């Protein structure tokens, strides 16, 4: 009887405790309130740097072609040989010319109203007198050295008959051939004079027309 009473007491106690647990109210849940929003700080305006105005590029000076430039000189070609050969033949057969004498051929002097290649004319004249059988020509090197002594370039003409005779004496020549082109440059006239160096006497002269090629 005693054991049964204990068992019943324990059972009743257990049921009582279970009922108490079931009737316990749940713990209150605290409501989480959102934190108050902080007012945003006003943003400071970013200072703007004023843009530098673009300076328009200044136009450069207007270049004009030089309208005053002289035109290129017209190059003329002459038939020097055609004009010189007949005169050289007459000179070699002239009276008073001693065979074997030394002849100085001066550069052709341009006395026309324009520009012409006097060096070409001089070279043609020397070629026409080469191997002539009567004169020994003063070499171009000897003539060049004699001109340099007078302060002239090898291409310069002596200009006057007196200078030509003076040069001829310095190089030991007996005769000097003085030549000049004169008149209109488009149709010049070639004049040749053979002079005796010792006296300056003109022992032969001739002239002829020079045509362009």
UniProtKB/Swiss-Prot annotation:
Knockout mutant characteristics: Mutant shows sensitivity to many beta-lactams. Absence of both LpoA and LpoB leads to a decrease in peptide cross-linking and to cell lysis.
Lipidation (N-palmitoyl cysteine): 20
GO cellular component, one term: periplasmic side of cell outer membrane
InterPro entries: LpoB
PROSITE patterns: PROKAR_LIPOPROTEIN
Compartment(s) of residence: Cell outer membrane
Residues in the signal sequence: 1-19
Topology term for the membrane: Lipid-anchor
PANTHER family with a match to the protein in the record: PENICILLIN-BINDING PROTEIN ACTIVATOR LPOB
Family as reported in the entry's similarity comment: Belongs to the LpoB family.
HAMAP family the UniProt entry points to: LpoB (MF_01889)
Protein name from the UniProt record: Penicillin-binding protein activator LpoB
């Amino acid at each position: 009887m005693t054991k049964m009473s204990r068992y019943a007491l324990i059972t009743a106690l257990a049921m009582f405790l279970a009922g108490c647990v079931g009737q316990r109210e749940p713990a209150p849940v605290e409501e989480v309130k959102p934190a108050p929003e902080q007012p945003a700080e006003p943003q400071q305006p970013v200072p703007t740097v004023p843009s530098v105005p673009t300076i328009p590029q200044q136009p450069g000076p207007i270049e004009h072609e030089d309208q005053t430039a002289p035109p290129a000189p017209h190059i003329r070609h002459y038939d020097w040989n055609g004009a010189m050969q007949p005169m050289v033949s007459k000179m070699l057969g002239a009276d008073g010319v001693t065979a074997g004498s030394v002849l100085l051929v001066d550069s052709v002097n341009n006395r026309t109203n324009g520009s012409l290649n006097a060096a070409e004319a001089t070279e043609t004249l020397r070629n026409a007198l080469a191997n002539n059988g009567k004169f020994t020509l003063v070499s171009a090197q000897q003539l060049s050295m004699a001109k340099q002594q007078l302060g002239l370039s090898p291409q310069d003409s002596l200009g006057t008959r007196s200078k030509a005779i003076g040069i001829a004496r310095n190089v030991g020549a007996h005769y000097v051939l003085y030549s000049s082109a004169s008149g209109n440059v488009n149709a010049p006239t070639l004049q040749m004079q053979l002079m005796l160096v010792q006296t300056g006497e003109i022992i032969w002269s001739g002239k002829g027309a020079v045509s362009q090629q």
